[in-house]
C-alpha cells in the first residue's frame, strides 16, 4: 500500500477493506482498449480463520468476489477519460469481515476514493449505496446481511454528483431476496414502480454522503502531503480527425 499511487482503508461496522489503485507510466504498443483490472481478494484471516489446506493457502476467488469485481468495474470504467490506455489496476483486499456487513458496496466506494488521491485521471468521486426493502415497506440504507435476508428486495445504486447538486445515476443492480415469495404470502409490502422510484430518489442522500467523505479525504491528503500530482499521459486516438470527418459525411 505505501508504494501504491493511491491506497485507502475503508470500513463499515467491523468489516474493513484495503483498496489500492495503480497505473502504468506508459502505454503498451498496440493497445486499442482501456486495460482496467479490478480485483477483490477475500482473506480467510479477515473472519478470524486459517485455511485448512496443507500449505495454508487461500483458495480460488469465490463467486461473491467475482461479482464484486464486476459490480466495481461498471461505474468505474466509464469514469476514465477517452483515450486513456494506461494499464490500471484497482485491488481490494478484505482485511476484516464481521459477518454482519457486506463488503461489496464498501469496495466500490473505497475504489473511487483510492483513485481520487492517486493522480490517475478519473472523473470522480463516485458514491454507491445498497438499499433493502423491508417487509413493512421501508427502504433500509446499507443493510446488514440479516436485514437483506429479511427484506423482499434490494437495489445497489452508484452515481456521481452534478454541478447543480443532483445525482446522475450510473449503475443500478436490483433483485428480489431468496425468500421474497414467502414474505409476500405472509402479507409483506410489494415493490411497485412507484416504490422503486422512491428508492432512486432516497439513494441520492447516501450517495452524496459517500462523495462528501471522499472529498474530505482528498482535502485532508492535500493539507498533509501537498497537492496531488496528476500522472502524465497522452490520449491514444483510435482514428484521426480526417477519418472521423470522412465517416461523418457518409
Where do the language-model regions lie?
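A short catalytic or substrate-binding loop motif that flags glycine-/basic-rich loops and adjacent residues
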Residues: 1-2, 149
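Mobile "lid/hinge" segments at catalytic clefts and subdomain interfaces of large enzymes
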Residues: 119-250
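Glycine-rich, flexible beta-strand/loop modules in the N-terminal catalytic cores of phosphate-handling
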Residues: 4-89, 94-101, 168, 173-188, ...
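DPxDG-like acidic metal-binding loop motif
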Residues: 14, 108, 115
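Short, aromatic/basic-enriched loop-to-helix "N-cap" motif that marks the start
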Residues: 101-102, 203
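Small-residue-enriched alpha-helical segments and adjacent helix-cap loops
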Residues: 51, 55-57, 67, 71-72, ...
Amino acid at each position: 500500500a505505501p508504494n501504491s499511487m493511491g491506497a485507502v482503508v475503508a470500513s463499515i461496522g467491523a468489516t474493513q477493506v484495503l483498496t489500492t489503485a495503480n497505473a502504468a507510466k506508459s502505454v503498451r504498443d498496440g493497445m486499442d482498449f482501456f486495460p482496467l483490472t479490478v480485483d477483490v481478494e477475500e482473506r480467510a484471516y479477515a473472519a478470524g480463520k486459517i485455511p485448512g489446506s496443507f500449505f495454508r493457502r487461500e483458495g480460488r476467488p469465490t463467486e461473491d468476489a467475482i461479482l464484486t469485481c464486476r459490480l466495481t468495474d461498471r461505474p468505474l470504467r466509464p469514469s476514465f477519460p477517452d483515450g486513456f490506455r494506461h494499464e490500471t489496476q484497482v485491488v481490494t483486499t478484505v482485511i476484516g469481515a464481521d459477518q454482519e456487513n457486506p463488503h461489496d458496496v464498501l469496495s466500490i466506494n473505497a475504489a473511487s476514493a483510492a483513485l481520487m488521491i492517486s493522480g490517475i485521471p478519473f472523473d470522480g468521486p463516485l458514491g454507491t449505496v445498497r438499499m433493502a426493502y423491508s417487509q413493512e415497506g421501508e427502504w433500509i440504507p446499507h443493510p446488514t446481511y440479516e436485514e437483506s435476508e429479511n427484506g423482499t428486495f434490494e437495489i445497489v445504486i452508484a452515481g456521481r454528483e452534478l454541478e447543480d447538486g443532483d445525482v446522475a445515476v450510473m449503475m443500478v443492480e436490483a433483485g428480489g431476496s431468496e425468500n421474497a415469495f414467502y414474505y409476500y404470502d405472509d402479507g409483506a409490502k410489494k415493490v411497485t414502480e412507484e416504490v422503486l422510484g422512491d428508492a432512486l430518489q432516497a439513494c441520492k442522500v447516501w450517495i452524496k454522503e459517500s462523495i462528501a467523505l471522499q472529498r474530505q479525504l482528498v482535502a485532508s491528503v492535500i493539507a498533509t502531503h501537498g497537492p496531488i500530482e496528476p500522472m502524465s499521459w497522452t490520449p491514444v486516438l483510435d482514428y484521426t480527425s480526417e477519418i472521423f470527418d470522412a465517416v461523418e459525411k457518409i
